[in-house]
């Protein structure tokens, strides 16, 4: 009887796990989020808390004010020397921009030899995303980076808005002398929008990639040389009678992600140069694929002259039917929630049952420093967020953790381990949009529930055998 009872407990645990996973509510052009989960995440799932930040999709949320107001642009220059400890964790961040200028999901490491930050993609992971906490509504954004390399590995530098507007640089690891540029308006896929710029080896060399975004035109430049110019008047669509030109406040994302993952759509795999090799030399040494970020500069431009202003702190959408520049206002609305139960509808929900927001930079899943084996004797630190990134989610019940970060040759080595032996990679299809190069975040509550249920299931199985 004890054995039967134990296995019944196991079955209940598994059933609970399945129910919780299947309870996810999705959002898209035909289905908006319900009021109890009002925010549509960038990846098409409804929820509260972090779902209401980080490019919350205003179009498919319960209402246009379900997403949190977006912190207004602030000109800045960020050098990523010894910067990992200053990063906020996107999975715990609740909107307090005084805590962090940049968020991460995935694995990041300081790289002292080049005074830079490594975005790492360990074997079978979804990659890493670095995101700004503030949005840019017209401005000049430049990033000095080294891309990754090899087939199936994609590096991205993009501006992306909660209305699906997008300005892109993407770099396919199989072609290191080409920067792919693209733009999207409200996520509309148009294959004629892309264009390439030739350059020198993007893996071996730092290049400064720049987006100079104005109301009526945008330029893409590499190392100060303009390689492409798009004019707003070129984007007019006679059918919709609208300019299909990126025009809404956008966050800055820099990422590395597995475009060649075998679970991706065939077109995505082909575009990224073929299936990714998870046993490539990089996976042995230094232990992951990587891109390197040295510096990002942001210069904010004035908003359109006819912008409605009732403050100076945040961008808000004023319409649930259109999401154009004319539908953006500048206000002093709150940009921070009190708990992961909050949303734009009620930022203070859950405040009485949750502790005061902690610094997101101090709640990273792990942080470690270790002496270098390299002759420079520099030190490294590494951080790993608690959810998979880059349009990928894992069935792993808990986060990976960086246990070491030592120098080996020219790159930092990170030992990444999982608390579950078996991981199943389920990467979503990418339809040509660089928005898929950013993190797929399931949220703290979902991650905690999955972890708790897996632990209970394993415990029950062990108990069943013992009894």
Curated annotation (Swiss-Prot):
Q: Which residues form the signal peptide?
A: 1-23
Gene Ontology molecular functions: glycosyltransferase activity; hydrolase activity, hydrolyzing O-glycosyl compounds
Q: How does it sit in the membrane?
A: Lipid-anchor; GPI-anchor
Give the Low complexity compositional bias ranges. 351-444
A GO CC annotation recorded here is: cellular bud neck septin ring
Q: Which cysteines are joined by disulfide bonds?
A: 56-67
This protein's record includes keyword Protein transport: no
- Region (Disordered) residue ranges read 337-444
PTM summary from the entry reads:
The GPI-anchor is attached to the protein in the endoplasmic reticulum and serves to target the protein to the cell surface. There, the glucosamine-inositol phospholipid moiety is cleaved off and the GPI-modified mannoprotein is covalently attached via its lipidless GPI glycan remnant to the 1,6-beta-glucan of the outer cell wall layer.
Report the subcellular localization. Secreted, Cell wall; Membrane
Q: How does activity depend on temperature?
A: Optimum temperature is 37 degrees Celsius.
* Cross-referenced CDD domains: ChtBD1_GH16, GH16_fungal_CRH1_transglycosylase
- Keyword set for this entry? Cell wall, Cell wall biogenesis/degradation, Disulfide bond, Glycoprotein, Glycosidase, Glycosyltransferase, GPI-anchor, Hydrolase, Lipoprotein, Membrane, Secreted, Signal, Transferase
Domain spans labelled GH16: 63-280
Q: Which residues form the propeptide?
A: 446-467
**Record field: catalytic activity:** Random endo-hydrolysis of N-acetyl-beta-D-glucosaminide (1->4)-beta-linkages in chitin and chitodextrins
User: Could you say which residues bind chitin here?
Assistant: 170, 257, 268
The catalytic activity of this protein is classed by the Enzyme Commission as 3.2.1.14, 2.4.-.-
Lipid linkage positions (GPI-anchor amidated asparagine): 445
Q: Can you tell me which residues form the catalytic site?
A: 166, 170
Q: Which residues are glycosylated?
A: 28, 96, 190, 196, 233, 237, 261, 297, 310
What the protein does?
Answer: Dual chitinase/transglycosylase that plays a role in cell wall architecture. Chitinase and transglycosylase activities are coupled. Required for the polysaccharide cross-linking at the septa and the cell wall. More specifically, transfers chitin to both beta(1-3)- and beta(1-6)glucan in the cell wall. The minimal number of intact hexopyranose units required in the molecule of the acceptor oligosaccharide is two and the effectivity of the acceptor increased with the increasing length of its oligosaccharide chain.
Q: What is this protein called?
A: Congo red hypersensitive protein 2
């Amino acid at each position: 009887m004890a054995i039967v009872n134990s296995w019944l407990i196991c079955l209940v645990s598994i059933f609970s796990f399945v129910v919780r996973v299947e309870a996810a509510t999705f959002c898209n052009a035909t289905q908006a989020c319900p009021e109890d989960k009002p925010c549509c995440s960038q990846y098409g799932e409804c929820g509260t808390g972090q779902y209401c930040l980080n490019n919350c999709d205003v179009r498919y949320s319960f209402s246009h004010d379900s997403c949190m107001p977006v912190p207004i642009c602030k000109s800045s220059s960020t050098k990523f020397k010894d910067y990992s400890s200053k990063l906020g964790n996107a999975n715990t961040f609740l909107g307090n921009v005084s805590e962090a200028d940049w968020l991460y999901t995935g694995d990041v490491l300081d790289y002292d030899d080049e005074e830079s930050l490594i975005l790492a993609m360990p074997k079978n992971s979804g990659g890493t995303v670095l995101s700004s906490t503030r949005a840019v509504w017209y401005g000049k954004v430049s990033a000095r980076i080294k891309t990754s390399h090899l087939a199936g590995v994609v590096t991205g530098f993009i501006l992306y808005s909660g209305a699906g507007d997008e300005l892109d640089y993407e770099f396919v690891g199989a072609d290191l002398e080409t920067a792919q540029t693209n733009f999207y308006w409200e996520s509309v896929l148009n294959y004629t929008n892309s264009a390439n710029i030739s350059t020198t080896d993007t893996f071996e060399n730092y290049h400064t990639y720049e987006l100079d975004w104005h109301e009526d035109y945008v330029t893409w430049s590499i190392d100060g040389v303009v390689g492409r110019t798009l004019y707003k008047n070129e984007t007019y669509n006679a059918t919709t009678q609208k300019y299909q030109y990126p025009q809404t406040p956008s966050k800055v994302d820099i990422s590395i992600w597995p475009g060649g993952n075998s679970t991706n759509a065939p077109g995505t795999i082909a575009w990224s140069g073929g299936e990714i090799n998870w046993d490539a030399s990089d996976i042995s040494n230094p232990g992951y694929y990587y891109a390197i970020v040295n510096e990002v500069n942001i210069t904010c431009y004035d908003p359109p002259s006819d912008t409605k202003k009732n403050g100076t702190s945040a961008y808000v959408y004023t319409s649930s039917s259109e999401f154009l520049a004319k539908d953006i206002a500048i206000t002093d609305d709150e940009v921070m929630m009190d708990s992961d139960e909050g949303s734009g509808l009620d930022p203070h929900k859950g405040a009485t049952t949750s502790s005061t927001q902690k610094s997101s930079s101090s709640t990273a899943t792990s942080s470690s420093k270790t002496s270098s084996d390299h002759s420079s004797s520099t030190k490294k630190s590494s951080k790993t967020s608690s959810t998979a990134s880059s349009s990928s989610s894992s069935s792993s019940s808990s986060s990976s953790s960086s246990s070491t970060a030592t120098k080996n040759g020219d790159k930092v080595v990170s030992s990444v381990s999982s608390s579950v032996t078996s991981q199943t990679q389920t990467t979503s299809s990418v339809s040509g949009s660089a928005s898929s190069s950013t993190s797929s975040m399931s949220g703290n509550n979902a991650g905690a529930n999955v972890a708790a249920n897996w632990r209970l299931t394993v415990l029950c199985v062990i108990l069943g055998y013992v009894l």
